Amino acid sequence: MDVINILDELTRVLVDAADVHQAAAYTTGSGVAQPTGFVTALAGGSSVVASGTADTLAAGDVFNVQNALPARFQARAQWTANLSTINALRQLETTNGALKFPELANGQLLGRPMNECSDMDGVINASQTNHILAYGDFNNFVIVDRIGSTLEVIPNLLGANGRPTGQRGAFLWYRTGSDVLVDNAFRILNA
């Protein structure tokens, strides 16, 4: 009876794998044999906003990122960050113990939608750049998919010794690309 739904299960597994692969590429892809991720496209350019204190996330940094975005792009701007960064912002309190960003409970930050992107930096590492928070008009980030995909069934997988392992495999091939159209439509925080 296990064979009845094998194609449905195989489809589910392959679609999930493609989604995970695409999410990473659309965020940090290099643009060489893969899509250009929005973090990669913005890193090192004028869209980067440095944190007030190196290797630290402070409430003032959030305001600085939002203020740095030109008015032209503010109307459709949204936030995106790793869940660790979102949770760090949720924990920020005033000296009286009130939350600095209580609207994060409703998926908003400073009046704009907040989106989770697990492929962004979530831990601040002192030895590298940390692009932990992005804000901008994502209508200026384009994703292009070529219609169709190819699934190749591999009847015998080979081990390191070049002999069959008794396992079967599948290779899913599809084409996709992405890039930022207008760098000025985004700001990204480097903590």
Feature locations, PLM:
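Structured, hydrophobic secondary-structure cores that serve as assembly/anchoring elements
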Residues: M1-A191
